[in-house]
């Protein structure tokens, strides 16, 4: 991959409901973090298929953010959302 290329980052965050954030845009709300994570990885995987690396960062119960899926190391489809 070109060293100047930008990696896509998808954030799964809780703000009254779970949402996916990427490039300043929010998804529709999700009731469950696992559903938002699954869809965030699917979106990140589409970027990967188009030649752009991507990862998914998930907000944990302690409000910290943790990497949960990375196109350079993780398989698709991913396992269930990791417990953070």
What are these regions (language model features)?
Residues 1-7, 35, 47:
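Short, solvent-exposed secondary-structure boundary motifs
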Residues 33-51:
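Acidic, aromatic-enriched beta-alpha/helix-loop junctions
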Residues 19, 39, 66-70:
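Secondary-structure boundary/capping motif
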Residues 49-84:
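Short, mixed-charge low-complexity intrinsically disordered segments
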Residues 23-35:
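A short, exposed loop/beta-hairpin motif centered on an aromatic-Gly-Thr core
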Residues 2-26:
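Short aromatic-glycine-(Arg/Gly/Cys) micro-motifs in beta-strand/loop hairpins
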